[in-house]
C-alpha cells in the first residue's frame, strides 16, 4: 500500500518552530501573537520540512518547484512541450476556487502561442496529480463525466501556490483549507465541493460537514451570501455541522437547525 507523504500540518510546523499552541499559551497576547506570526509564514510559505527554518524561503520554494516537481514531471513522462506545461500550471494556480475543464485549460494555453490539445491537458493534469503537485476536488452534485472533466484543483502546499500569485490571500486561504481537508480525510472521494443551484466550497460526507471559506465576513453582503449558501445546503444534504472559515474572525449564529459557526483559520488548523 502506498504511503502518502504531505508537507507539515500546522501543528507539526509550530512544533518545529518551537512555538507552543496549548490553550494557556494562546490566552496570552504574546503567545497568540507568536502563533499568528508563524501562521502568516505557514500561510505564504507552506510546510515543506527542509524550508521551515530557512530565511531565503522563496528561493528554496522555487528550487523545489523547478528541480523536484517540474523536472520530475517532465523527465518521468517524457514531456516535450515544457512551455505548455509551465503555462498550464500557472493557469491552474490562477484558477484556484473555480472549477476548470480540460478543454478550457487547453484553449487558454493555446492562446499563448503553444498548441495544447485537450487530450494532452488531461494527461498533464494526471501527471501533476501523481507527482503530488496538485490534488483534485470534484462536484458532489455533478454527473460522473462532469465530475472528472470539470473539477477544482488545489496545490498540495501553499508555498508553491504562492509563487504564482500576487496579493491573493483569498485563494491561499481556500487552498490551505482544501489541502488540510485532503490531508485529514484522503484524496479519494472524501472531500467535495457542491455546485447545483447552490455553491458551497467543501462538503465532507463522512462528517456531514459543510464549509464556506471567506477571508473576512465583515462586509454585510459577503456575510449574507455565505450564510445563505450554508442554509441552503442543509436542505439538500445532511449537515451535522456548518462552518465558515475566515482568516482571523470568529462568531456563532443560530440561523439554522444546527447553527453556523465562524471559525478562524488558526483554530481550524489546530483542532
For every predicted segment, state its role.
Residues 1-11:
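A short helix-turn-beta junction within AAA+ P-loop NTPase domains corresponding to the substrate/partner-engaging
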Residues 212-219, 223-226:
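Terminal-proximal interaction/regulatory segments of ATP-powered molecular machines
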Residues 248-271:
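Domain-level recognition of nuclease-like catalytic cores that cleave nucleotide substrates
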Residues 16-25, 67-68:
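Conserved AAA+ ATPase "sensor/coupling" helix adjacent to the nucleotide-binding pocket
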Residues 192-194, 240-246:
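Short, hydrophobic beta-strand segments that form beta-sheet elements in well-ordered domains
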Residues 25-65:
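Amphipathic alpha-helical "lid/sensor" segments that cap RecA-like P-loop NTPase cores
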Residues 223-236:
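Short, charged, amphipathic alpha-helix that recurs within catalytic cores of restriction-modification
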Residues 52-210, 215:
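Accessory nucleic acid-recognition modules appended to NTPase machines
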